């Protein structure tokens, strides 16, 4: 069973641990089963994209990766 967290989608949070420590940003998604959140502009990774009809050349995109919910704190106010 997933744990209930106080952080919700759209909340402002501050990263308190990791490479992006100190950044304040908005939560894009909460993954309660994994205990992780995706935060805008935090832990951005480059992902390879295969060529498709929409994107015939393929290439790389920057995508936010999930971080552990214990590494963020909700910003009040």
UniProtKB/Swiss-Prot annotation:
Keywords: Ribonucleoprotein, Ribosomal protein, RNA-binding, rRNA-binding. Part of the 50S ribosomal subunit. GO terms for biological process: translation. PROSITE patterns: RIBOSOMAL_L24. NCBIfam families: rplX_bact. CDD domains: KOW_RPL26. It comes from the Bacteria. Belongs to the universal ribosomal protein uL24 family. This is Large ribosomal subunit protein uL24. One of two assembly initiator proteins, it binds directly to the 5'-end of the 23S rRNA, where it nucleates assembly of the 50S subunit. One of the proteins that surrounds the polypeptide exit tunnel on the outside of the subunit. One of its GO terms (cellular component) is ribosome. GO terms for molecular function: rRNA binding; structural constituent of ribosome. The gene is rplX.
């Amino acid at each position: 069973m997933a744990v209930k967290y106080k952080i919700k989608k759209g909340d402002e949070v501050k990263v308190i641990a990791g490479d992006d420590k100190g950044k304040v940003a908005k939560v894009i998604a909460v993954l309660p089963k994994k205990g992780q959140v995706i935060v805008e502009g935090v832990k951005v990774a480059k992902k390879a994209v295969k060529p498709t009809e929409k994107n015939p050349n393929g290439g790389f995109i920057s995508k936010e990766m999930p971080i552990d919910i214990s590494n963020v704190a909700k910003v009040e106010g």
